[in-house]
């Protein structure tokens, strides 16, 4: 194998974390910075009880989410008018350019998710949407849910 040949990379758990523009802490996984990825990133996210992200979208990049554990409310679409309740084991696909905002639906349990994006520089395509953060229907989530 030559010096320029692609090779596998291992990124050890606990390698580090960073504060995302979305207002949450991400645990570093696969990205351009950690593994030389060219077309994807893959991270672990833990949302504390009652925590939420800032309203945002990912310009030109798709996202896939697997909720490992917990319960989350996801607001999405134009004006964040669409809503789904997510449970551990659920998968979510988010097309590029779709506004979204996840909320941990539990007051006592964290929500943990694996997130993959078609952007190896994960934070570069994040576009914050502060005008959506204070929408009236977001101030009172549709019921709280405890995980068990």
Q: How should these model regions be labeled?
A:
Residues 1-39, 54-55, 128-148:
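A short, N-terminal "cap"/entry segment at the start of jelly-roll beta-barrel domains
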Residues 56-58, 100:
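Histidine-centered divalent metal-coordination motifs
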Residues 52, 61-88:
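A short beta-strand-loop-beta hairpin characteristic of the jelly-roll/cupin
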Residues 83, 87-88, 96-124:
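Ligand-binding loop in jelly-roll beta-barrel domains
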Residues 26, 42-46, 64, 83, ...:
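Conserved hydrophobic/aromatic beta-strand scaffold that supports enzyme active sites
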């Amino acid at each position: 194998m030559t010096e320029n040949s692609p090779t596998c990379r291992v990124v050890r758990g606990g390698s580090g974390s960073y504060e995302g523009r979305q207002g949450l802490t991400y645990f570093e996984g696969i990205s351009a910075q950690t593994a030389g990825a060219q077309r994807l990133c893959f991270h672990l996210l833990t949302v504390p009880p009652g925590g939420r992200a800032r309203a945002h979208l990912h310009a030109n990049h798709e996202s896939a989410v697997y909720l490992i554990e917990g319960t989350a409310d996801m607001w999405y679409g134009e004006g964040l008018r669409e809503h789904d309740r997510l449970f551990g084991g659920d998968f979510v696909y988010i097309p590029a350019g779709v506004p979204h905002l996840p909320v941990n639906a539990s007051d006592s349990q964290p929500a943990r998710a694996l997130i993959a994006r078609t952007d190896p520089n994960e934070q570069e395509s994040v576009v914050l949407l502060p005008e959506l953060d204070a929408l009236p229907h977001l101030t009172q989530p549709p019921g709280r849910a405890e995980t068990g």
